[in-house]
A protein has these predicted regions:
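Aromatic- and acidic-residue-enriched carbohydrate-binding clefts of CAZyme catalytic domains
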Residues: 103-134, 200-202
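Short, conserved phosphate-binding/catalytic loop or strand-edge motifs used
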Residues: 160-164
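Hydrophobic "anchor" residues on beta-strands that sit immediately upstream
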Residues: 67, 165, 243
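Conserved, mostly hydrophobic/aromatic
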Residues: 71, 166, 247
Length: 407
């Protein structure tokens, strides 16, 4: 499970949720993930994330494995992560759709023309020339760039000393089962021991809110992907623990029962990235604390309205905010602690919950970072209350819905 937080204060609270899970027989490995963009906004380094993770493990007396993820890294920024991280999410989105060398394309087509039947799937995968050409022109350059990035990390860090994930989710269209099969086969052929793959799914995975789309279609795609992974592992020598990774995975409550049911059906693993919404739980806790902490939470919102375009433009593909549905300054200025928390907390049964308010605050962590020591002071002064929000959110609203809901 991708955890961690932008302000590096909630690791122990998150581990508390995982310790509750462990007592119920649910084994979850925490992965602290933070991207290069987030480090630049927060003026932090990968070493800061490593320090925070190690400190949280000591504080919580965590006895299991844990990792620090260089999240969404490329060849341009990977070097700063190599010393501190032992999990690397290779982001090759910029290479998807770029053309590989013609000789590589023709070789890919020639070696993949045999029919492929995946047990559990009604139809064989499409391996006609047109299908293979489309796959090669769309993904082959990205696959080769992932292999180059992996090799660069291995040459510096050493073989077997880190976990590799490949991200293919930041594209317009979902991969077909055939796409995923040949992506994984090609990664294996190039010697990339991929342990997690993040494909694109149909529908919108907006930041910090529920899934928007056809749940039945998602279920079909998720199940087909699990079947493909199972077969590729048998054929290719990729790690037996190769799993699907769900990015922007927090708060997708309508999908969690589907995911849980299918990973149990196929005895499969799952990597769910949730770290981005931890700061919203911090903000909820500060609102509930009242006084100056509540006033700071309100001021962060007021500033976010003034800087709407600046804050939302980097996330335009993963948010959907109707500015007309955002509560006006005059209204929020008069809110009590409970009113602010009710509007922010992701509780769809609460009529006060405002999905637009939540999404805007999700991308407004830059403003909290500008408060710097003042924001951290309020977090530490209200550590127990804030930590309670973080632990309950991760366990009650995420882990339980995936792993304990049998429906």
């Amino acid at each position: 499970m991708g955890i961690g937080d932008r302000f590096a204060r909630q690791g122990a609270a998150q581990l508390k949720a995982l310790q509750i899970s462990e007592k119920k027989g649910i084994a979850i490995t925490p992965v602290w993930n933070k991207s290069n963009r987030e480090h630049e906004i927060m003026y932090t380094t990968p070493e800061d994330t490593r320090y925070a993770a190690d400190a949280a493990v000591r504080e919580a007396n965590w006895q299991g494995q844990y990792f620090v993820d260089a999240d969404h890294i490329t060849l341009a920024n990977v070097d700063r992560f190599i010393g501190a991280c032992d999990y690397f999410t290779l982001d090759v989105a910029e290479s998807i759709g770029k053309t590989a060398a013609d000789a590589d394309i023709q070789a890919f087509i020639l070696r993949n023309q045999d029919p492929v039947k995946i047990p559990g799937m009604a139809e064989p995968l499409a391996t006609n020339r047109n299908s293979l050409e489309r796959m090669a022109y769309t993904y082959l350059k990205a696959i080769h760039d992932a292999a180059l990035l992996y090799q660069h990390i291995e040459n510096t860090k050493g073989k077997g000393r880190f976990i590799t994930e490949v991200s293919m989710d930041e594209v317009a269209n979902a991969q077909t089962p055939a796409d995923l099969y040949f992506i994984l086969k090609e990664l294996a052929r190039l010697g990339v021991p991929v342990s997690a793959i993040a494909p694109k799914f149909t529908g919108r995975f907006n930041k910090g809110v529920d899934y928007v789309g056809d749940i039945g279609r998602f279920e079909r795609e998720f199940e087909e992907n699990l079947l493909v992974i199972k077969q590729v592992v048998k054929e290719s020598g990729l790690p037996s623990y190769l799993k699907l990774s769900i990015h922007s995975g927090s708060d997708k409550f309508s999908l969690y029962p589907v995911m849980g049911r299918l990973i149990r059906k196929y005895d499969a693993g799952l990597h769910l990235k949730t770290a981005g919404t931890t700061w919203l739980e911090e903000l909820t806790g500060l609102a509930l604390a009242g006084g100056d902490a509540l006033e700071m939470a309100k001021n962060i919102y007021f500033k976010s309205l003034d800087r709407f375009d600046e804050l939302t433009s980097p996330y335009v593909t993963v948010i959907n905010i109707d500015r007309g549905q955002l509560p006006p300054v005059q209204e929020v200025a008069g809110w009590t602690s409970r009113q602010f928390a009710d509007a922010l907390r992701h509780d769809q049964s609460n009529r006060s919950y405002n999905v637009h308010f939540r999404q805007l605050l999700h991308v407004s962590y830059r403003i909290a970072a500008e408060y710097s020591n003042i924001f951290i002071h309020h977090l530490m002064a209200n550590k127990e209350l804030v930590g309670q929000q973080v632990s309950e959110n991760l366990y009650d609203r995420h882990i339980r819905r995936i792993f304990e809901d049998k429906h």
